[in-house]
């Protein structure tokens, strides 16, 4: 399978690129080449908002869009003339208001999440544009990722505290729930879409 992955050098996109290379897939990564590339990937070196003709005569079995934060990110990629069979957009559970019951369910109301500000709304707008424009589009709304190549010390903190037998405090008198999703589980689930 020929896969285009947006990003490819940091955390989720890097793990995904390396995962699919290890499975024998032909993996192309779209990024600005500002960080080292993973072994076995084919680099498409450019800014996703200024693609020009980088995709002339290119066809992918799958686009795995991990780095789109706004509808403009998706519009720019689609305007490039890229040809593909399926498009998977990694959105976010930030599209659900924090007042929704957790764990979040796909059929819950979406809207502003005061914790995430415009991030969730921008992801919602990107989802809507993609679904209105692309027939074979799939949206995933994962919660907090953790795992290999994590570049921020957030999600690992409670795990580290548990391993080290240290206390950590959960907001809202311990009633605030958080969902975690290992990046390896994301890659394993993608083969079933």
Please describe what each predicted stretch is.
Residues 3-23:
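N-terminal Rossmann NAD(P)H-binding glycine-rich loop of SDR-like oxidoreductase domains
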Residues 161-181:
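A conserved pocket-lining segment of Rossmann-fold NAD(P)-dependent short-chain dehydrogenase/reductase
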Residues 127-149:
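Conserved beta-loop-beta element that borders a ligand/cofactor-binding pocket
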Residues 30-34:
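N-terminal Rossmann-fold cofactor-binding loop
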Residues 76-122, 130-133, 138:
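Conserved Rossmann-fold NAD(P)-dependent oxidoreductase catalytic core, especially the SDR/UDP-sugar
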Residues 35-36, 42-89, 95-98:
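NAD(P)H-binding glycine-rich loop region in Rossmannoid oxidoreductase-like domains
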Residues 147-157:
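Glycine/proline-rich active-site loop of Rossmann-fold NAD(P)-dependent oxidoreductases
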Residues 191-193:
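Conserved small/polar residues in nucleotide/adenosyl-binding loops
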